C-alpha cells in the first residue's frame, strides 16, 4: 500500500469534489485497514462481511440510505449491489452526507456501479 497519509489526503480531496468516493483494488491492499484507521472514528463504518447487515440492505436499500444521519463507509460494498441505485437516487435528491464505498478490483464491473454512480463518484484504486 502507498503511504497511508498520502491516500487519506487524496480521499479527502475526492470527497471535496464528489458526494461518493469509491476505493477499489485487489485483495489485501489495505483498503479496509486504511478506512478503519483513518475514517471510522468520525464516520459511521459498515462492514458488509456481516451477513445480517447485507440482508437488511438488500431488503430495503432506500430505507438504509434514508436512515443515515452522518457520513458513512460501506466496506465490501460489492456484497450488496442493490445499494448502488439507492445511492444514485439519494445523491440526485440532495443527500447531504458523503459516502465512501470500498471493494475489490472487479467491484467496478458489477452491473449498476458505473451506470448508477457515473459523475457522482470519484474512483481511487489501491495496488
Language-model segments: residues:
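Phosphate-binding site recognition
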Residues: 1-127
Amino acid at each position: 500500500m502507498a503511504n497511508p497519509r498520502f491516500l487519506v489526503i487524496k480521499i479527502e480531496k475526492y470527497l471535496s469534489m464528489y458526494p461518493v468516493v469509491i476505493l477499489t483494488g485487489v485483495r489485501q491492499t489495505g483498503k479496509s485497514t486504511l478506512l478503519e484507521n483513518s475514517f471510522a472514528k468520525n464516520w459511521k463504518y459498515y462492514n458488509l462481511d456481516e451477513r445480517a447487515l447485507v440482508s437488511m440492505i438488500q431488503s430495503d436499500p432506500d430505507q438504509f440510505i434514508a436512515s443515515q444521519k452522518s457520513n458513512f463507509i460501506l466496506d465490501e460494498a460489492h456484497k450488496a449491489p442493490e445499494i448502488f441505485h439507492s445511492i444514485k437516487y439519494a445523491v440526485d435528491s440532495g443527500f447531504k452526507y458523503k459516502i465512501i464505498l470500498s471493494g475489490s478490483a472487479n467491484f467496478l464491473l458489477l452491473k449498476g456501479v458505473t451506470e448508477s454512480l457515473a459523475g457522482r463518484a470519484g474512483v481511487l484504486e489501491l495496488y
